[in-house]
Amino acid sequence: MNVFVLTFFICIIYLLFDLIKKNKKLKDEPPTPKLALPLIGHLYLLGDRPNRSFLELSKRYGGIFKIWMGEYPTVVLTDPDHVNEVWCKQFLNFTNRPHFNSLDQFSSGFRNLSFSDYPLWSELRKLVSSSFTKSKVKGISNLLETQTNYLINTMNNYSINNKPFNPKKYIHKLTLNVVCMIAFSKEIKNDEDVNEGDMARLTKPKEMILKHLGSSNFCDFVPLVRPLFYLKNKRFDQTLKQVREYIKEIYDDHLLNLDLNSPPKDIMDLLIMSTNDSKEDIIIQTCIDFLIAGSDTVGVTIEWFLVYISNNPIIQEKCFNELFNAFSNSNNTDNNNNNSTITTAIGFGDEYSSKTPFLNACIKEVLRIKPVTSLGLPRIANDDTFVNGYRIPKGTQIIENIYGLSNSDQLIDDPTTFNPYRWLEYQKLKSFQNDLKQQQQQQQQQQQQQQQLQLQQEQQEQEQQKINLEFNNNNNNNNNNNNNNSNNKHKYYNDLDKISIPFSTGRRGCVGVQLGEAELYIVCANLVYNFKIESWDGKKINELEDFGIIIHPSSHNLKITKRNNK
């Protein structure tokens, strides 16, 4: 009995000290919500969509605030200046990831590109980044077009048969194939059903891994309760084992057929050659990175694109008309049979995208309103430091609130409305300001060249003053428009390039940005060009995201109608 009483009192004392520790205010620390509870800290404030909870907290406590996520002090950044300070200026102090148990399991001891520490991360990044340059991505345009062909012909069959089309598995088959070909030259056959073969072998484990990593695992933040999650973590290990075995088979095949005298044909070859086959586990884990993250981020963004153009038919028609006017001479249909085979009419590159500014704006707006990695991947402070005057102790977890940056009404006008036109207006304003700056620079150069001629110099000065006055008036007009009916707007208000960073920023940003942009453009352009896309039941599709490490739309069916592009 005395043992139970002693244990009870020890628990009470521990909880009391934990309560005091978490609620003690430190000098120069960021603003903090009032009550952090023992063990769980502020986790009770986050709900089932932490991205939205962090957005609301940022409105109350500002662009940098501190919370306790269980036992981990955490600083959340929802301000471009703070993000730039941590992700770019103080990069070396914030290079590493937190060592949570679930991340340890997934990365086999932090031995992959996503979660490894410096300097291993730096070595891996240098190796793989060469595979994602603009020229390399341009070189795989045939692969992207081929996979898009498969998708649009599948959709055409649904259109012909007037059946509801659930896009998720088919889109993810496309993006998975692209990643598999680039990473290890393996293709899921076009005639292979999405519920069979490699798709079936990979899809479910991939979904389970993403769900586990994105579920804000309680035992990650409160290690004391980890034994209670033994069975859940064991199932996670078993799921990871399935994926590792799949990649290991491919790895063994690469070793068997590797030609050291020829250039590497894919990322796995590149890693094997660069490490002399001495880091098998790291190679396998890095390829799992590409398999899971590389396919799902793009695939889910395409899903969101279809949701928003379905819910906004006027915008969809404007996209189609733009594409039709630009590419209607492309012969993309083979009418030799009743089930006309479609081929991609639109590829990737400046020669295509330069003709479709409105479609480009639609894709950017999807990335703004639904950045699929809504909270990015966390970092940790390696040493004590200050961020714009706020003290950040060593070991503090840092979260980049990507969703909050692009969806806060303190940073952007009407953030919850899908409005591609905002990007067109923004580009016009940027172009106008750049032209004025160039004009000023030219005038200054002319002044320097003609200083010996007093009369010409005076004329130049008068012209310069006039240009400066016009420039200031234009800026004042723009500021007045932006500040109508509101006070104290953020200095980056409606500065879309500053607040919309769906691929993150800095040296540890997404390595596959070029590939992702190419996939998004080719797929979205060809789908809108070939089909009218609506919700199956005629109702608006739910735009509320399901939270995870990747935020995705709820399951839905689409009505696909083939367009007549002749």
Curated annotation (Swiss-Prot):
According to the UniProt entry, what is the EC number of this protein? 1.14.-.-
Q: What SUPFAM superfamilies does this protein map onto?
A: Cytochrome P450
For the ligand (heme), the binding residues are C510
Its main subcellular localisation, reduced to a broad class, is membrane
Low complexity: compositionally biased ranges:
472-487
- Spell out the Pfam families in the cross-references: p450
Question: Where does the sequence pass through the membrane?
Answer: 1-21
Q: Quote the PROSITE patterns the UniProt record gives.
A: CYTOCHROME_P450
Protein name, UniProt field? Probable cytochrome P450 519D1
What is the organism of origin for this protein? Dictyostelium discoideum (Social amoeba)
Gene name linked to the record: cyp519D1
